[in-house]
């Protein structure tokens, strides 16, 4: 699933090509995504100028004068810039054509993504109004993390992946940040010390920033706005390495399901 670094990589990749350009045409070949694509999407944005593209958590927000397109990549989706006359493949569900023979193409084999339209205040939208702070901003800090974790009995891994706590810390990066912080993923969130919160907060920011620099993590379907894969997979310490030697102590890494998500950790290095 594309996580925050992949979504931010996509935003940075497509924005320079499309910012300030006018929509010439909208082609929707399959409306049946996680939620149906609005029937009036073309009517809302055709001949309108794309002002900019924001990101909130894992959502991309395409800003027009009259509202926003809310885009979620789902489990297997990707957005890329193509020539407007490039023929679509079977999983290419949406094209938005702009001037200069450019188009934004949405590909989603599993169709768990979403393309929605709203003309309400964007941060008040029901998909966005409950979200926690962005992890790469000052609002997400160790004092916040320590305060928010008090009296929380759930495992720190499932807790940190809750978008009400902080957005965008998905499974890959939660595994990595916990390993780098030497924190056991099954540890109760409420048992984190202030020092552990200091380290954990720093490692979350570091892992996400490094992943963005590398263009995200491609494990299966993800490509960035330029059609290229992300390269952070080469930097992973634990995710996808269950049973292999820990890069620190060389003992085998443990893999198990936690909250229905694959969790990989070192029982020796993480306490």
UniProtKB/Swiss-Prot annotation:
One record GO biological process: base-excision repair
Active-site residues, record numbering mapped to chain: 2 (schiff-base intermediate with dna), 3 (proton donor), 58 (proton donor), 261 (proton donor)
EC number: 3.2.2.23, 4.2.99.18
Keywords for this protein: DNA damage, DNA repair, DNA-binding, Glycosidase, Hydrolase, Lyase, Metal-binding, Multifunctional enzyme, Zinc, Zinc-finger
Cofactors (names): Zn(2+)
Cited Pfam families: Fapy_DNA_glyco (PF01149), H2TH (PF06831), zf-FPG_IleRS (PF06827)
Keyword NADP: no
Catalytic activity: Hydrolysis of DNA containing ring-opened 7-methylguanine residues, releasing 2,6-diamino-4-hydroxy-5-(N-methyl)formamidopyrimidine; 2'-deoxyribonucleotide-(2'-deoxyribose 5'-phosphate)-2'-deoxyribonucleotide-DNA = a 3'-end 2'-deoxyribonucleotide-(2,3-dehydro-2,3-deoxyribose 5'-phosphate)-DNA + a 5'-end 5'-phospho-2'-deoxyribonucleoside-DNA + H(+)
Domain of life: Bacteria
Molecular function via GO: 8-oxo-7,8-dihydroguanine DNA N-glycosylase activity; class I DNA-(apurinic or apyrimidinic site) endonuclease activity; damaged DNA binding; zinc ion binding
Zinc finger residue extent: FPG-type: 237-271
Annotated cofactor note: Binds 1 zinc ion per subunit.
PROSITE patterns: FPG_CAT (PS51068), ZF_FPG_2 (PS51066)
Record: residues binding DNA: 91, 110, 152
Keyword Manganese part of the UniProt annotation: no
Family: Belongs to the FPG family.
Functional note: Involved in base excision repair of DNA damaged by oxidation or by mutagenic agents. Acts as a DNA glycosylase that recognizes and removes damaged bases. Has a preference for oxidized purines, such as 7,8-dihydro-8-oxoguanine (8-oxoG). Has AP (apurinic/apyrimidinic) lyase activity and introduces nicks in the DNA strand. Cleaves the DNA backbone by beta-delta elimination to generate a single-strand break at the site of the removed base with both 3'- and 5'-phosphates.
Subunit structure: Monomer.
Full protein name: Formamidopyrimidine-DNA glycosylase
